[in-house]
């Protein structure tokens, strides 16, 4: 979605 932070 372009926002959901992923490490």
Curated annotation (Swiss-Prot):
Belongs to the pyrokinin family. Keywords: Amidation, Neuropeptide, Secreted. GO terms for cellular component: extracellular region. It is found in: Secreted. It comes from the Eukaryota. Myoactive. The keyword Secreted applies. The modification Leucine amide is found at residue 7. GO terms for biological process: neuropeptide signaling pathway. This is Pyrokinin-1.
């Amino acid at each position: 979605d372009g926002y959901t932070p992923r490490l």
